[in-house]
């Protein structure tokens, strides 16, 4: 018969293992996350759906997915969102698989997160949990405009400058061409009038012809008289 001390010694390791297992248990939480500001739409498949979340129980959690960093806050959804677990079930021996969805949970909250930029903490700055929170909204660059999109505005100004000046130059050229064309037309009119009207001012061609004709008639008359 075993002594009580031996039995206690045999039981103690089991209790220790159970305590270790209880300490190693982790609570599993499901969070519905809505991301915005993503450039590459396939980055979730590239990172194999792995991410790191900091401060999930706080008002403003921060999440890192691959090289992207997102920050956001919890919001109410328009309706009830249901989360399923996707699985594969083989239908027949030939290898045809069927996608099966298994209900996991439902929620009426979502974590709306926007891509943000982190800055290195400098000496003398106040401690903000090691992370700087950026208040940014969609299409709103009023906060830190020079850092985020200054180069974009410079290129837009350079591209818009020649484009805006070009119509003005064309209008100037067209006005100059019209002015020169009007001047040439006026010069042609003046030259044409000078060629058609070589006589002195005040005398018409009909008067000149009549005077010449009368002169020849007078000459003939004088010659006849002499003869």
Curated annotation (Swiss-Prot):
Task performed by this protein: Involved in RNA polymerase III-mediated transcription. Integral, tightly associated component of the DNA-binding TFIIIC2 subcomplex that directly binds tRNA and virus-associated RNA promoters.
Compositionally biased spans, kind Basic and acidic residues: 186-195
Protein name (database record): General transcription factor 3C polypeptide 6
Gene Ontology MF, one: DNA binding
Residues spanning the membrane: none
Entries under InterPro entries matching the protein: GTF3C6-like (IPR042771), TFIIIC_triple_barrel (IPR019481)
Subunit structure as annotated in this protein's UniProt entry: Part of the TFIIIC subcomplex TFIIIC2, consisting of six subunits, GTF3C1, GTF3C2, GTF3C3, GTF3C4, GTF3C5 and GTF3C6. Interacts with GTF3C4 and GTF3C5.
Alphabetically ordered keywords of this record: DNA-binding, Nucleus, Transcription
GO biological-process terms attached to the record: transcription by RNA polymerase III
Organism: Mus musculus (Mouse)
Pfam families found in the cross-reference section: TFIIIC_sub6
Region annotation Disordered: where it falls in the sequence: 157-227
Superkingdom as given in the UniProt entry: Eukaryota
Protein family: Belongs to the TFIIIC subunit 6 family.
Encoding gene per record: Gtf3c6
Composition-biased stretches (Polar residues): 203-227
Keyword DNA-binding attributed: yes
Gene Ontology cellular-component terms listed: nucleus
């Amino acid at each position: 018969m075993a002594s009580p001390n031996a039995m206690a010694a045999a039981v103690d390791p089991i209790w220790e293992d159970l305590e270790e297992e209880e300490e190693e248990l982790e609570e599993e939480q499901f969070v519905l996350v809505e991301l915005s500001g993503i450039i590459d739409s396939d980055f979730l498949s590239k990172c194999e759906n792995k991410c790191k979340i900091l401060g999930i129980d706080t008002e403003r959690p921060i999440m890192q997915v691959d090289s992207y960093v997102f920050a956001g806050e919890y919001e109410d959804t328009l309706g009830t969102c249901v989360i399923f677990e996707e699985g594969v079930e083989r239908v027949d021996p030939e290898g045809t698989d069927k996608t099966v969805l298994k209900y996991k949970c439902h929620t009426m909250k979502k974590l709306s997160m926007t891509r943000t930029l982190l800055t290195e903490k400098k000496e003398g700055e106040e401690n903000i949990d090691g992370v700087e929170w950026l208040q940014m909204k969609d299409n709103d660059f009023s906060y830190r405009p020079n850092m985020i999109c200054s180069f974009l505005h410079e290129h837009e100004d350079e591209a818009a400058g020649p484009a805006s000046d070009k119509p003005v130059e064309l209008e100037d050229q067209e006005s100059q061409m019209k002015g020169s064309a009007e001047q040439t037309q006026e010069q042609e009119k003046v030259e044409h009038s000078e060629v058609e009207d070589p006589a002195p001012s005040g005398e018409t061609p009909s008067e000149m012809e009549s005077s010449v004709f009368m002169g020849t008639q007078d000459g003939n008359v004088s010659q006849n008289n002499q003869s």
